[in-house]
Amino acid sequence: MEKITLAPISRVEGEINLPGSKSLSNRALLLAALAKGTTKVTNLLDSDDIRHMLNALKALGVNYSLSEDKTVCTVEGVGGAFNWKNGLALFLGNAGTAMRPLTAALCLKGATEAEVVLTGEPRMKERPIKHLVDALRQAGASVQYLENEGYPPVAIRNSGLKGGKVQIDGSISSQFLTALLMAAPLAEGDMEIEIIGELVSKPYIDITLAMMKDFGVKVENRNYQTFVVKGNQSYLSPEKYLVEGDASSASYFLAAGAIKGKVKVTGIGKNSIQGDRLFANVLEAMGAKITWGDDFIQAEQGKLKGVDMDMNHIPDAAMTIATAALFAEGETVIRNIYNWRVKETDRLTAMATELRKVGATVEEGEDFIRIQPLPLTQFQHAEIATYNDHRMAMCFSLIALSDTPVTILDPKCTAKTFPTYFTEFEKLSERT
C-alpha cells in the first residue's frame, strides 16, 4: 500500500487558494442540469465525487463541456426531469453527494417510463438511504432495494412525484432532506415536508436553500420543522454560478496556522454560505487569532486550550478539532456527532483508534469523543490507517506539527475532495 511520511514541521506560513466545495459542486451540477438554459459553473472541484456526478449526468443525456483543468463546466440544462433508455445503471462510487440527490431527481416524471439502477462501491452499500426512500415513497415514487433493505443499490422508475404531505427523518443525515428539497419543485403537486426527530447539520440545508434560490426557486422554511415547496415549477439558469472554496478543506490549513504559525485561506470568507466556515470560531474559542475578510479567513497561532462543544453544525470540520485537540491545554470534548458514524467510514471509531496510535488518551462515546492533550515530545510515530476516507488522511497530517513524524497510509484517498492536498500542505510547511 502506498504511504507518505511527513517529517516534523517547525512552522507553517503562507496562503492557500481553496479548491471548490464538494457539496456545492455537485449541487450546482445537478441544478444546472435540471434547469432551463445554459449554466457556466466556475471553480468546480476536480475530484472523484464530482466525476461520478458528471458521468451520471452524461449517461442521463445531459450535454456539458469541461475546461481542460476541469474547474469550469458549461451545462446545457434539460429544463425538467431527465429522460433515459430503460435499463440504465449508474455507478456512483462512494459519492453521497451524488447518490442521495440523484435518487430523488430520478423519481421525477419522464417523457417515457424507464427504470435506472443506482449503485456504488462496497462502502456505499453500507451507507443508509432508507429515510430518503421512505419520504420519496410517501410522495408517490417507485424505488426498490436490490440487495439490503434500506441501502443502495436501488432501482428507480421515473413514474413521478405527486407531492402532498411527506415526513422525513432528519436525525441521520441532512443529505436526505437536501435531495428531497431539490426534486420537490419539479413534482406534480405542492409538497409539505415535515421533519421527524432532530435535523442534523442544519447549515447544509441552508446551502441547499440558498442554491435553489440562485436557480429561481424559493422554499418556505418554517423554523426547520416544515418546508413548503410549490410543485410544477422550473429551475432557471443564473447563467453563471461560482462555486465557493471548500470550507471543510479550509479547516486543516486554519488549524495548522492556529497550532504553529499563520495561514490565510482564500475562496471563502465571512459571507460564505457554508456552515463549516464556523470552524474558525471554534479555533478562536480555543485561543487562536482569527481574521475574517470577504474572500479570506486567516488563523494565527495562539495559546490553545481544550473546549467542550456541540459540533453537530460542522460535522466534517469538527474532525479537524479532534487532531488539533492534541496541541491544546486541557481536554477537548466534541459532542452530538453521531452522524460521523455514517460517513465515508465510521469516523468516530476510526478517529479514536488512530489518535490512540499516536499516544493520545481518548474516550469514544456513542455520539461524542473526549480527547486528552499530548506534550509535543510524547507523540509516537505511527502508521495512520485512513479507511478510504479523505478526511482521515487530511486530519492526521496535523500530527507532523509535533516533534514526531507521521506516516499516512493510502494518501491518495484525498482524491475524493482534494487530490493535491499533501502538495499544498507541504508548500506551507517549514522545517528547521
Swiss-Prot record:
Gene3D superfamilies: Enolpyruvate transferase domain
PROSITE patterns linked to this entry: EPSP_SYNTHASE_1, EPSP_SYNTHASE_2
Annotated residues for binding of 3-phosphoshikimate: 22-23, 27, 173-175, 201, 316, 339, 343
Keywords: Amino-acid biosynthesis, Aromatic amino acid biosynthesis, Cytoplasm, Transferase
Reactions listed under catalytic activity: 3-phosphoshikimate + phosphoenolpyruvate = 5-O-(1-carboxyvinyl)-3-phosphoshikimate + phosphate
Top-rank taxon: Bacteria
Pathway this chain belongs to: Metabolic intermediate biosynthesis; chorismate biosynthesis; chorismate from D-erythrose 4-phosphate and phosphoenolpyruvate: step 6/7
Cellular component aspect of the GO annotation: cytoplasm
GO molecular function: 3-phosphoshikimate 1-carboxyvinyltransferase activity
Main enzyme class: transferase
One of the protein's GO biological processes: amino acid biosynthetic process
Entries under Pfam families matching the protein: EPSP_synthase (PF00275)
Residues that, per the record, bind phosphoenolpyruvate: 22, 96, 127, 175, 347, 391, 416
Compartments where found: Cytoplasm
InterPro entries hit by this protein: Enolpyruvate_Tfrase_dom (IPR001986), Enolpyruvate_Tfrase_sf (IPR036968), EPSP_synthase (IPR006264), EPSP_synthase_CS (IPR023193), RNA3'P_cycl/enolpyr_Trfase_a/b (IPR013792)
Annotated catalytic residues: 316 (proton acceptor)
CDD domains named among the record's database cross-references: EPSP_synthase
EC number: 2.5.1.19
Subunit structure and binding partners: Monomer.
Annotated family: Belongs to the EPSP synthase family.
Entry function: Catalyzes the transfer of the enolpyruvyl moiety of phosphoenolpyruvate (PEP) to the 5-hydroxyl of shikimate-3-phosphate (S3P) to produce enolpyruvyl shikimate-3-phosphate and inorganic phosphate.
The name this protein goes by in its record: 3-phosphoshikimate 1-carboxyvinyltransferase
Encoding gene (name): aroA
